[in-house]
């Protein structure tokens, strides 16, 4: 947790994909054999009210607690693979490149941000992404859900969920109680988004968010909204989610919209898992969209996108997104 930041706060987000039987598609892209978990934020939320988002939230000091080192493997990076050095002309996202030891935590950022994403997924959706023992889980395929036999009774699990929501440090206590650890090895580094400076100017909420992708063999046995920050949930394939957006059934903030469009390139669950595992070794750069105000709406420009005819489709998509949101 970086307390030195003044203009934004660090966060972690999880794109949770679960294998599912392919069914007749709602979009021309054909059938997809996996679904993504989407959560609807409360209409009272101070950030993106009523939007559908991926699970995630702010990093807490408990996510960087040295006590995690007593549960996780003692190997470097707790057994996570090493990211290759960035090519010339690019750099590792500051979120990951920051030396956390200098900030008072012996836990690497790559570990703590994954713990945050897993904790928030439990708080918001009731899903526990854990593995028995000290991990990592055996095998290289999509991760299996935690066996139901390892879960406490529903009432006890609900009480643990409430406790973690009230005090993030209770998540480590829950892991000890269950004899499990967060399945950080199932989360692949995917992207890094920094909230742009919006029309409200200085003082608006901004987040530097690490986005991870996790592939599960199948849907977890239990999924439920917390009826606090989250009022509903939806499992949907990427193209179906985009179709729902186009028909204005649901609305996505720009990063979610972009990532869903990106996932539309993968109709095969196992191809997505392989790509994400291989691609994670490359790391990622921080992206901060730049706001462009037009006469009929707002546009968010991404790195590498120019305001010429060749990029018109991209700009039109973002313009449509903001026009519908305002």
Language-model features: locations:
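N-terminal leader/linker segments that precede catalytic domains of diphosphate-processing enzymes
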Residues: 1-326
């Amino acid at each position: 947790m970086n307390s030195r930041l003044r203009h934004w706060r660090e966060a972690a987000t999880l794109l949770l994909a679960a294998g599912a039987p392919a069914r007749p598609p709602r979009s021309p892209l054909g059938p997809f054999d996996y679904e993504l978990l989407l959560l609807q934020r409360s209409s009272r939320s101070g950030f993106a009210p009523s939007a559908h988002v991926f699970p995630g939230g702010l990093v807490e000091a408990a996510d960087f607690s040295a006590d995690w080192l007593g549960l996780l493997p003692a190997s470097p990076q707790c057994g996570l693979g090493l990211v290759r050095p960035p090519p010339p002309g690019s750099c590792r996202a500051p979120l990951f490149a920051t030396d956390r030891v200098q900030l008072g935590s012996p836990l690497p950022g790559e570990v703590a941000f994954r713990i945050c994403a897993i904790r928030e997924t439990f708080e918001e959706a009731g899903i526990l992404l854990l593995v028995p023992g000290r991990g990592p889980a055996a095998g290289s395929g999509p991760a299996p859900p935690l066996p139901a036999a390892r879960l406490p009774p529903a009432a006890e699990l609900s009480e643990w969920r409430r406790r973690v929501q009230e005090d993030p440090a209770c998540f480590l206590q829950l892991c000890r109680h269950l004899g499990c650890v967060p399945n950080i090895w199932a989360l692949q580094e995917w992207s890094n988004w920094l909230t742009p400076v919006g029309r409200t100017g200085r003082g608006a909420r901004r987040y530097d968010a690490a986005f991870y992708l996790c592939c599960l063999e199948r849907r977890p046995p239990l999924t439920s909204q917390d009826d606090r920050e989250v009022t509903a949930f939806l499992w949907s394939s990427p193209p179906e989610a985009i179709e729902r957006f186009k028909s204005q059934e649901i609305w996505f903030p720009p990063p979610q919209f972009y990532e869903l469009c990106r996932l539309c390139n993968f109709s095969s669950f196992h191809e997505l898992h392989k790509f994400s595992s291989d691609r994670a070794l490359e790391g990622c750069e921080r992206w901060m969209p730049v706001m462009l105000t037009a006469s009929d709406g707002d546009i968010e420009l991404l790195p590498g996108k120019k305001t010429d005819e060749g990029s018109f489709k991209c700009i039109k998509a973002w313009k449509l997104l903001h026009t519908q949101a305002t």
